[in-house]
Each structure stands twice: as C-alpha cells, then as structure tokens.
From Swiss-Prot:
Pfam families: FMN_dh (PF01070)
Family affiliation: Belongs to the IPP isomerase type 2 family.
Organism in which the protein naturally occurs: Thermococcus onnurineus (strain NA1)
Binding annotation for substrate: 13-14, 104-106, 171
EC code(s) of this entry: 5.3.3.2
Oligomeric form and interacting partners: Homooctamer. Dimer of tetramers.
Listed GO CC annotations: cytoplasm
Residue numbers binding FMN: 71-73, 104, 132, 203, 233, 282-284, 303-304
Source taxonomy: Archaea, Methanobacteriati, Methanobacteriota, Thermococci, Thermococcales
Record's protein name: Isopentenyl-diphosphate delta-isomerase
Top-level EC class: isomerase
Gene3D superfamilies: Aldolase class I
Length: 374
C-alpha cells in the first residue's frame, strides 16, 4: 500500500469532507438560536416592498445583497471536483454581486499544482473573493509555520481580495490527523496584520466566536469576523464518520454539538466590538438571515445548501437557492417596515428562551438591543 505524505493526506481529507457532507446527516443536533429571536410585526409598515434596498458595504466594496457564499472546498483529490464546485459558486456570486470564499488553501501551499481548484477569476472577474488558511499553521509550535509568504501566496495566486484565517480547534481536536497547535496564534496574526496588504477575516467553522476572542481579534487589527456558529454543519460530526477507531468516534460524538450558537455569537461580537460580522452557522432561510442582520451582522453566510447544486455544476440551481433567501429577507424587511439593512438594525427585537438566558449572563442585553446593533 502506498504511504501518503501529509500534504497528500490533506487533499484526500478534503474529498472525504465533501463526500460526508453530501451523503450523511452532519448537522448539529441543536439549533443556531434564531428561533429565540423575534421580530415585531408592523401592520402599517409605511413602505412599499419594491423600494426595499438590500445592498450593503463591506471592506470598501458595495454588494447587492447581504449574503455571502462561505468557503467550502479546494485542493481535493484530483482537484476537478473542487474546481467545479468553486467555479459554479463563483458564477452565481458574479451574477448576484455577492462575495464568496474558497475552502482551506493548505493543500495549495504545499501542493502548488492544486491551485486551479481555487481559481475562479476566469469565470468571475469581479467577485469579491476571500482566500483561506488555517490558524494552527501560524502557531509558534507548528513545524514549518506559516508567515506572510504563505499568506501572500494564498491571496495572490488566486487573485483574491482578502484572506480568511479559520479558527477550528474543535475540528482539529477530534480529527485523527488534526493539528492542535494553537500557542502563539494571536501574536502571529498580529505580526501578519502589521505588514499584510490585504484585509484579514477571522473565521470560525461551527463552534462560534465569543466576545472575549472577538475583543482580542479587534485589538490586533483584524478587519472582520465570521462567527461560524453552532447550529449548522457539525465538523465534529463529519469527523465522527471519518474516525478510525472507537475512541475517535466517541470523542467526535461527545463534541458533536459543542460551541456557541450562531445567534448568541453574533450578539456577543456585536456587543463587544465594532467589527463587521458575517453570520454563518445553520443559515437555512431568509427569515433567520434577516434576524442576523437585525442583530448587527453585515452578511449572512451560507454553505451546505449550495453544495448539492454546485457539485452538479448547476449555476442556476445555486442562484435559485440564493434568490429564495433574498426574497425571504426582503419580505421580512417589508413586514417590519425596514427600507434598508441600516433600518433593519433599528427595528424592535424580542429575545426569549435559551438565547435570552445566555445573553443576560454575558452582556447588558437592554443596552445591546437599544444601542449596540447599529
């Protein structure tokens, strides 16, 4: 049997991740918390639905809709599948003028021949594109740790506009071949940010960002946070199906629903920082997306619902899903009397249940609802 090197194993793992997301139920067993967030219906909205403006500004660019296609893949075995997915998503993003990310580029850094699986400029010359590297690769205890050279390579090889640094300690801790080196990551990111000429987005992958972490990230100049909250795809769940033995399966199962729910994470980050927020994590309809926007997010990020049509190369299928979300956001805004996203952040919200209980212990909830969502 052939012995694979670490980079080849990374490429194989990316393929397995796509396969499990498509073929198995890898959703969290708990919600993302937005069922506890309620709009107050306005019987007299005092606006026309067709005057609603869904555009938003982010990192110096204006976008037509407050939705982002979250990074999913790249560098898979053979690379053709990842390339097909990314190009399909990019065509949809280009058509709708919304941003998109690519999956982790670790495979590309070590195996440059996989670069084409991330490259979409030939089909989406204008799309705001976000590259993607993992936080552990910048840790002081990581052999061959990354620095500005690798960060520049990730962005410039694919002509991206920004770089996401994904923080995924949960997934790494339950992954058979996971990288659990995180010592010195914040310092390394501060050093990178000081000389890196592109915006940096700190991104979680399903366990959420707390206000403590958000404050640290803001203090070193990070440009935006993708909260990547609990309630959508569970990467511990994905690793459960990849586990090689009973010990690994048990660990992944126990931590399947670990993390901070997306709604809670949005509230904490908005309360504690001034950073732009991308709300990903179980965003499966436009009403929940509108709630995230009302809570202070700039974008709602979506991944898994777009994967199935993207695997087929079905650009229209991807656009159809996104247009459904867009219409649901627009209709929600009409029913609360919000002409634009800025006004949506000022409409009354009622927070109940577990989400309220959590937030009352963590932040000044009345102050957040009254003053901190803008």
């Amino acid at each position: 049997m052939k012995a694979f090197d670490k980079e080849e194993l990374t490429i194989i793992r990316k393929f397995e991740h796509i396969e499990h997301c498509l073929k198995r139920n890898v959703q969290a067993h708990v919600s993302n918390g937005f069922e506890d967030v309620h709009f107050v219906h306005m019987s007299l909205p005092e606006i026309d639905k067709d005057e609603i403006d869904l555009s938003v500004e982010f990192l110096g660019r204006k976008f037509d809709y407050p939705i982002m296609i979250a990074g999913m893949t790249g560098g898979t075995k053979g690379s053709q599948l990842a390339g097909k997915i990314n190009k399909t998503l990019a065509k949809a993003a280009q058509e709708l003028n919304i941003p998109m990310g690519v999956g982790s580029q670790r495979a590309m850094i070590r195996k440059p021949e996989t670069w084409e699986s991330y490259y979409v400029r030939d089909v989406a010359p204008d799309v705001f594109l976000v590259g993607n590297l993992g936080a552990p690769q910048f840790a002081e205890t990581m052999p061959d740790r990354y620095g500005i050279e690798e960060a520049l390579k990730a962005v410039e090889t694919i002509q991206a506009d920004a770089l996401a640094i994904h923080m995924n300690p949960l997934q790494e801790s339950v992954q058979p071949e996971g990288d659990t080196q995180y010592r010195g990551v914040l310092k390394a990111l501060a050093e990178l940010k000081a000389e890196f000429p592109y915006p940096i987005i700190a991104k979680e992958t399903g366990a959420g960002v707390s206000m403590e972490v958000a404050i640290r990230l803001e203090s070193i100049g990070i440009d935006a946070i993708d909260v990547g909250g609990l309630g959508g795809t569970s990467w511990s769940g994905v690793e459960y199906y990849r586990a090689k033995d009973e010990l690994g399966r048990n660990l992944a199962l126990k931590f399947w629903d670990w993390g901070i729910k997306t709604a809670i994470s949005v509230a904490e980050v908005r309360y504690a920082t001034e950073l732009p927020i991308i709300a990903t994590g179980g965003m499966r309809d436009g009403i929940a997306m509108a709630k995230a926007l009302a809570m202070g997010a700039t974008f709602a990020g979506v991944a898994l619902p777009l994967l199935r049509p993207a695997v087929k190369g079905d650009v229209e299928g991807v656009i159809k899903v996104l247009e459904r979300y867009i219409e649901e956001i627009r209709n929600t805004m009409f029913l609360v009397g919000a002409r634009n996203v800025e006004e949506l952040r000022k409409v009354p919200l009622v927070i109940t249940g577990f989400t309220r209980e959590w937030l009352e212990q963590r932040i000044d909830l009345p102050v957040y609802l009254r003053d901190r969502r803008i």
